[in-house]
From Swiss-Prot:
Belongs to the metallo-dependent hydrolases superfamily. Hydantoinase/dihydropyrimidinase family. This is Dihydropyrimidinase-related protein 5. NCBIfam families: D-hydantoinase. GO terms for biological process: axon guidance; negative regulation of dendrite morphogenesis. InterPro entries: Amidohydro-rel, Hydantoinase/dihydroPyrase, Metal-dep_hydrolase_composite, Metal_Hydrolase, Metallo-dep_Hydrolases_sf. GO terms for molecular function: hydrolase activity, acting on carbon-nitrogen (but not peptide) bonds. Homotetramer, and heterotetramer with other DPYS-like proteins. Interacts with DPYSL2, DPYSL3 and DPYSL4. Interacts with SEPTIN4 isoform 4. Interacts with MAP2 and TUBB3. Keywords: Cytoplasm, Methylation, Phosphoprotein. SUPFAM superfamilies: Composite domain of metallo-dependent hydrolases, Metallo-dependent hydrolases.
Amino acid sequence: MLANSASVRILIKGGKVVNDDCTHEADVYIESGIIQQVGRELMIPGGAKVIDATGKLVIPGGIDTSTHFHQTFMNATCVDDFYHGTKAALVGGTTMIIGHVLPDKETSLVEAYEKCRALADPKVCCDYALHVGITWWAPKVKAEMETLVREKGVNSFQMFMTYKDLYMLRDSELYQVFHACRDIGAIPRVHAENGELVAEGAKEALDLGITGPEGIEISHPEELEAEATHRVITIANRTHCPIYLVNVSSISAGDVIAAAKMQGKVVLAETTNAHATLTGLHYYHQDWSHAAAYVTVPPLRLDTNTSTYLMSLLANDTLNIVASDHRPFTTKQKAMGKEDFTKIPHGVSGVQDRMSVVWERGVVGGKMDENRFVAVTSSNAAKILNLYPRKGRIIPGADADVVVWDPEATKTISASTQVQGGDFNLYENMRCHGVPLVTISRGRVVYENGVFMCAEGTGKFCPLRSFPDIVYKKLVQREKTLKVRGVDRTPYLGDVAIVVHPGKKEMGTPLADTPTRPVTRHGGMRDLHESSFSLSGSQIDDHVPKRASARILAPPGGRSSGIW
């Protein structure tokens, strides 16, 4: 489909328009890449392509907030570049992705960003934006963060509390990054796990002879995620900065987030479709390649209640977004860690299946309605990224990123039919209700009835504005009312004690009532010849009159006498 969106007219007729807050029957007219009209019995010019959506839902295109196309990680390069990755996204009903720029330590953030743009711009099939990773801290990094926000259209930065000696930041560095984010109105995204203890756990597992994929689950227990989640929320709260938790994987971490929100802290959180639908039992599969295919961090959890619990947290807005965290590797690439689980590249696929999997487990599973589905797959992301209502809503004036969704149709997921890269699918043979029939991106039909019709490079970079209201509006007001102020008091004018440090010479004249004694010899031994004790003179009772001498007539015990 090479036609310019300015020349394309589309009428979606007879469907139910679903936004995050309402559902109503309406037709949708699209022209020049923009939704022009929404309603019944629309007056439209001739020549429009008519799409019959009777009995179907018309929803905003999905926004996947975490993808890793053409990224090299743990000595392996993800098998999907920006063309194949965005193609898979569109086939699955996602019309915008957010990629990751992950600079190495001591390297320029701006240069890494420009390299990623050079890879993406000629390849993308849908609109995209970028998060930039903060993997080290220095004044130069802070300056480049400001440049990226003010000149390059970046409004979010990713940090890691794990990946020790690679990407992990210390608490004090996170504190500084959060201050910088708050000042420039950016969103700090954090992968929360206790990296120090994860590293120790990995060493212990290897020492016990555990080398297989189960070592990932063993060395990344959920208590380390919960501890780090609480800690980073505390750090962010101390800096009056919002916090966005990524890859939330456990019940205990979800509970920490829920408690923080109840306390009024500005906390946002996303999980992945893998964590919200699968379990960590796969790590104990007898087939090594099967187990390794599920290796991601944080790992999938053994507790079989976890996935349904996370889906419930998505439904009640404790978790705001479900992303794919798409970073697929082949079995051959995963096999780099066949003798050592710490060398298995972390990453799974999911950009193509995200929407259908969440519909099946969320809506069909009775956890959420179609409006909440739109919220967690599209609208909330648009609001947090400061794109709403241009993206994430079906209204006049919004970008024409629209999906015709069949809630009753079914499909069976398989690696043999997937568009996304990799030779394995986590959801193999999973039967899903909810299928995208038509995907419209930038006002062009790019996928219809199983046929993909889009050339590479037709997507565009979307600059993101800072200070999104949903994130910062409350904090700006709080800072006005909760500003820390010192106490205006009368100065203290009395005496001040002088601190004498051991081993140092006299720092000043001691006060009259300060007890003193001679300096001890080296090694702490007193010199008895230099004792302050004296039989006469310089004694405390010298002023009391004394007799010169006295004769003792009877010693204590009485006088003694001879026996003869």
